[in-house]
């Protein structure tokens, strides 16, 4: 993909951004917790979430599409499949299904593409095994394919050493089908699972970063939901408005969950003019985000990292356009995402002439003028999109840009809508 320099301000209202990926995954998986059809409007039809929907179908659900609505009718009982459950490039799918299937009667095999099958899964497998699940795979169940022999678990208490929505969600799903649990983490991670379970009628109590969950004695209520726009996807265009002088963007109908808008608040700390307007929300807070261009200043970021881990590469682009040297710390998880996002982000910035260096758990970036470069995305959709945004300032050629479709299939069309010249 080739992005040319944008020589004019961005002035646009965006309403058709990618639907939220985290919510879409959960809508598909959590529909299995009910005995009635779930109605999901604006489901994200991207590679990762379509794989999740395919797995739900393989486990026995019937899926109908009526325009923008997906209707998911769950089976009476989750089926034992006679095929491998393919998660594609989605770590979220694999880790959440690990928890769900760990408590089901049957034998299940989860696998993914060559990139996902290299990513570490022990961070979820080990906690599940510690509470009684039977999971096996290569490298002591650290890499897929993963084999799961499901069974009902005893009630458990688990204090997670890391704040991770995927660890938390996997354990809660396993506990829901078993005998319940008590769970805690060092700080609150994304809380979509707790909110959606509560909205469906699960007996769940939350206090800060602690959760008490009772087992599911009867099926939960079905979902009836309009999936909001994804703040992580929308963030690329927030950064674009912050680095292209005199720009003004309104991002419509965006998920405003506090655990998902931390990156926007970092931009505010850097001097960005950003306003939030809450409008509605059944399971979650939803509204609009308005961004006007303002000069950015350097910042140090070391808290609530689990709330902005997906936005870190795009945040690095904002750092590169700020006055001074910015630092991101306590983000070691970036090294085990779709690629080593610390190393790849820093290498890409250096190729563009930006002074940047790796830290063990983050990166340091000094703002300066960037130059056009050829960037290898390493098959990481967020790396590709982040450097596409930087390309609006200096031009950019991005290799393996096809992976953008795993989360944001209309990203290029929105780039063109804001005035960019893009060659696929």
Curated annotation (Swiss-Prot):
Its EC number is 2.5.1.19. Pathway: Metabolic intermediate biosynthesis; chorismate biosynthesis; chorismate from D-erythrose 4-phosphate and phosphoenolpyruvate: step 6/7. It holds the Pfam family EPSP_synthase. InterPro entries: Enolpyruvate_Tfrase_dom, Enolpyruvate_Tfrase_sf, EPSP_synthase, EPSP_synthase_CS, RNA3'P_cycl/enolpyr_Trfase_a/b. HAMAP family: EPSP_synth. Monomer. This is 3-phosphoshikimate 1-carboxyvinyltransferase. The lineage of its organism: Bacteria, Pseudomonadati, Campylobacterota, Epsilonproteobacteria, Campylobacterales. The gene is aroA.
């Amino acid at each position: 993909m080739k992005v040319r320099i944008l020589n004019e301000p961005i002035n646009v209202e965006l309403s058709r951004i990618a639907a939220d990926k985290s919510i879409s995954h959960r809508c598909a998986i959590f529909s299995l917790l009910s005995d009635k059809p779930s109605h999901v409007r604006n489901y994200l039809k991207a590679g990762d979430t379509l794989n999740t929907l395919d797995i739900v179908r393989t486990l026995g659900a019937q899926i109908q599409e009526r325009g923008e609505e997906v209707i998911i009718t769950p089976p009476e009982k989750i089926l034992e499949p006679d095929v491998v459950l393919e998660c594609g490039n989605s770590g979220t799918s694999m880790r959440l299904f690990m928890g769900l299937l760990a408590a089901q009667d049957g034998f299940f095999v989860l696998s993914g593409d060559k990139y996902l099958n290299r990513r570490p899964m022990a961070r979820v497998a080990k906690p599940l095994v510690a509470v009684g699940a039977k999971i096996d795979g290569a490298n002591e169940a650290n890499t897929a394919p993963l084999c799961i022999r499901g069974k009902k678990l005893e009630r458990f208490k688990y204090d997670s050493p890391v704040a991770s929505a995927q660890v938390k969600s996997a354990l809660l799903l396993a506990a829901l089908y078993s005998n319940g649990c008590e769970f805690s983490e060092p700080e609150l991670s994304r809380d979509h699972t707790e909110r959606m379970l509560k909205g469906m009628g699960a007996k769940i109590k939350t206090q800060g970063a602690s959760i008490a969950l009772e087992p599911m004695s009867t099926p939960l209520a079905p979902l009836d939901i309009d999936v909001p726009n994804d703040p992580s996807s929308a963030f690329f265009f927030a950064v674009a408005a912050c680095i292209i002088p005199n720009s003004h963007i309104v991002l419509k109908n965006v998920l405003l969950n506090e655990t998902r808008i931390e990156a926007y608040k970092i931009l505010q700390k850097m001097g960005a003019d950003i306003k939030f307007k809450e409008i509605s929300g059944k399971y979650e807070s939803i509204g609009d985000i308005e961004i006007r261009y303002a000069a950015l200043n350097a910042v140090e970021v070391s808290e609530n990292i689990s709330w902005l881990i997906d936005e870190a590469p795009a945040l690095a682009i904002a750092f590169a356009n700020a006055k001074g040297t910015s630092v991101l710390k306590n983000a070691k998880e970036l090294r085990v995402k779709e690629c080593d996002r610390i190393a790849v982000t820093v290498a890409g910035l250096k190729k563009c002439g930006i002074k940047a260096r790796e830290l063990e758990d983050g990166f340091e970036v000094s703002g300066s003028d960037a130059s056009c470069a050829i960037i290898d995305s390493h098959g990481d959709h967020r790396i590709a999109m982040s450097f596409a945004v930087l390309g609006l300032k200096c031009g950019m050629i991005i290799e393996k840009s096809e992976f953008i479709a795993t989360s944001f299939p209309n990203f290029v069309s929105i780039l063109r809508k804001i005035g960019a010249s893009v060659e696929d």
